[in-house]
Design a protein with these regions (language model features):
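Active-site oxyanion-binding pockets that recognize sulfate/phosphate
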Residues: 16, 34-37, 92
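Conserved beta-strand-loop-beta-strand hairpin that lines the nucleotide-binding pocket
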Residues: 1-13, 56-129
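Long, contiguous hydrophobic alpha-helical segments, chiefly transmembrane helices and signal peptides
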Residues: 46-55, 63
């Protein structure tokens, strides 16, 4: 995994390989980066972890997590597959709940197809000061 600052942006970028421990490693980088604690840090960290787990489970390559420190906070996870993710139709299906979890935690979320694959993004509103 490689951690880098986005040039000219107040964000964090974490590149990850295709390894089952990537979700755990991303959690250890994302959580301390978020300046607010409490539920915002918990929600963003869990969402990033779930999206990275999806990349590891459903693709043959790694990807990148990016965060922008703004309001709302923006999380993006890029991968190199063009296939769109899908929400599970039946809640009793085993596994596959990552997008549903992100949908519950985030203010909004979506998918953007890119020339090199796709980006799943989510926004998180900061709690009032």
């Amino acid at each position: 995994m490689r951690v880098e600052r986005e040039p000219g942006e107040p964000g964090l970028a974490v590149s990850f390989s295709h390894h089952r421990d990537d979700s755990r490693m991303v959690r250890h980088v994302v959580r301390p980066w978020i300046r607010a604690g409490g539920s915002l840090a918990d929600d963003v960290t869990l969402a990033a972890s779930e999206l990275v787990a999806n990349v590891v489970e459903h693709t043959d390559d790694g990807g990148r997590v990016r965060l922008w420190d703004q309001d709302p906070l923006l999380l993006e996870v890029d991968d190199h597959e063009h296939g769109l993710p899908r929400l599970r139709e039946h809640p009793d299906e085993s596994g596959g709940r990552g997008l549903a979890i992100v949908g519950r935690l985030a203010e909004s979320w979506g998918v953007r197809v890119t020339p090199s694959g796709k980006t799943v993004w989510a926004t998180f509103r900061r709690p009032p000061a």
